[in-house]
Amino acid sequence: MKPMCIIAALSQLAVALPAGAQDKQTAVANFVGKDGKEDGRAQLTAAATGGVLIELEISGLPANKWVAFHVHETGRCDAATHHESAGGHFNPEKAEHGILAAKGPHAGDMPNQYVGQDGVLRAQVFDSMVTLDGKTDGIRGRALMVHANSDDYRSQPSGDAGERLSCGVIQ
């Protein structure tokens, strides 16, 4: 009877391990606006070949406008400091800012995103320069940020993207 219990326990453990591995391939970020209230959510999924797919929906943003979207270096979203607590763009390679910069981009630089007429940003963005849990390029524990203006993809150090409107810690 004891060997049968051990086999049953081991088989349950074997089934549980792949599920745990799957959890490491995903993350979430709950966004907080300037007022400190939750205004959106992102689901992040690690791609098998590298990079991370970010699917997000954030409300309460300026309607009909392109806005900058970045990964920031620090996983702190403090509305009292206008989300300055999130630090600068995630940049493990010490590159220049911007996808149009000769020595860029930062790993956290991503294309501008469009906010619809309803003030909601809905997007799917792929960042090929990051992973969820890599030693140098991992973004779990860092922050996603939506800015008030579009990124010009060149200005140093942050693309003249303007005020930080919404921030979410990647967990």
Task: State where each predicted segment sits.
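N-terminal leader/targeting pre-sequences
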Residues: 17-171
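Bacterial N-terminal signal peptides
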Residues: 5-15
